[in-house]
């Protein structure tokens, strides 16, 4: 008697700042089959999202390879095609609810996003923390103040944040920088 082969499941992501939502998605995918992460390159992220990832491709790849649910990490284009899936010998594509890939429904599994977390939200939390640290704690040295101000200004420029704002909304931004709809 032969054991039936588990499907190879592709999970595409940019994972610019890896968080527990990514881990949960990978865990769910691993329940279905062998997980192949299709990771977008730094160039694809810059071209599509408009910024350079905080962690470069090799750093993101190394982190993902260290996750027990992941069998393999491959570089991928922004949009996954059936041909790309075939080239990686994958049977299914798993994606979050923000899917824009053009894969037939029978080969696509959509999982809802993890509430309350996204890479964009992490960026906002870092910025808010830097602002709070810089404004509220007089113990910080001039050097740390300079670093904090530099980082704040860099983040504001990179993400085109209104220069007059001193705090950010707790809500993330959707694909292509559009605010997400609240439900």
Task: Please identify what each model-predicted range represents.
Residues 159-183:
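Divalent metal-dependent catalytic cores for phosphoryl transfer on phosphate-bearing substrates
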Residues 145-156:
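Amphipathic, well-packed alpha-helical segments that form the structural scaffold of globular domains
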Residues 17-20, 135, 139-142, 178-180:
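A short glycine-/small-residue-rich loop at the edge of a beta-strand within enzyme catalytic domains
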Residues 1-129:
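Nucleotidyltransferase catalytic core that binds NTPs
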């Amino acid at each position: 008697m032969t054991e039936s082969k588990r499907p190879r499941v592709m999970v595409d992501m940019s994972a610019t700042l890896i968080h527990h939502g990514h881990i949960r998605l990978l865990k769910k995918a691993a329940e279905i089959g062998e997980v192949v992460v299709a990771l977008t390159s730094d160039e694809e992220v810059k071209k599509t999202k408009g910024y350079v990832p905080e962690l470069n491709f090799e750093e993101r790849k190394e982190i993902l390879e260290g996750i027990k649910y992941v069998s393999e990490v491959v570089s991928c284009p922004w949009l996954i095609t059936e041909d790309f899936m075939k080239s990686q010998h994958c049977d299914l594509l798993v994606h979050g609810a923000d899917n824009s890939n053009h894969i037939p429904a029978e080969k696509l599994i959509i999982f809802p996003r993890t509430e309350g977390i996204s890479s964009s939200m992490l960026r906002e939390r870092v910025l808010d923390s830097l602002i709070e640290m810089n404004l509220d704690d007089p113990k910080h040295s001039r050097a740390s103040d300079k670093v904090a101000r530099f980082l704040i200004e860099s983040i504001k420029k990179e993400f085109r944040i209104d220069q007059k704002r001193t705090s950010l909304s707790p809500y993330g931004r959707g694909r292509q920088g559009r605010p997400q709809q609240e439900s």
